[in-house]
Amino acid sequence: MAKKPNKSDNTIAKNRTARHEFAIQDDYEAGLQLQGWEVKAIRNGKVNIAESYVFLRDGEAFISGVTITPLNAASTHVVADPTRTRKLLLNRKEIDKLLGAVNREGQTIVALSMYWKASWVKLKIGTARGKKLHDKRADSKSRDWARDKQRIMKHSTR
C-alpha cells in the first residue's frame, strides 16, 4: 500500500474565534517586522494570536496582543517583551483601503492566521464587522444542517 505524500502545512497559528465573532469582508497578506529571538520562538510554535488586534496610526499598521513566548536559550542577551506592538508591512494602497474600511464603514481589522511563506512570516488580516447573537446562531444551524445532510447522503447511497 502506497503512503500518502506528506503535505507540509505552513500555518503557524490560527485565530479561530475571529471567524466566529466577526463576518470577514476582505483579507490581506501582511509581513511582520520581527526580531531574531521572535523568529526562533515562532519556529518552535510559541505564538498565540487569539487576543490580537490591528490598529492604524500615522499611516502605518501595527498589531498588538500577539504573544510570542521567548525561548530560554535564544533570548539570554536581550530583554524579551512577549507582547510588544509589532509593525505590519503593507503597501500604501492596502493601508489606504484598510483606513477607509475602518473610518467610513465602521469595520475592524482582525488577525486571521500566521504562516510561513518561504522563509518569511506572514500574517493574514481581514476587515470584519462584528456578528450579532442571531447571526452566530444562524451560522451554527447552517453548519449543523450541512453536516447532517452529508451524513444522510452517505448512508442513503449504500
Swiss-Prot record:
In residue numbers, the region (Disordered) covers 136-158
**Keywords recorded for this protein, A-Z:** Cytoplasm, RNA-binding
Q: Where does it reside?
A: Cytoplasm
Provide a GO biological process annotation: trans-translation
Q: Which domain of life is it from?
A: Bacteria
> Which PANTHER family does the record associate with it?
SSRA-BINDING PROTEIN, TMRNA-BINDING COMPONENT OF TRANS-TRANSLATION TAGGING COMPLEX
Q: What HAMAP family has UniProt attached to this entry?
A: SmpB
Name of the protein: SsrA-binding protein
Which organism is the protein's source?
Photobacterium profundum (strain SS9)
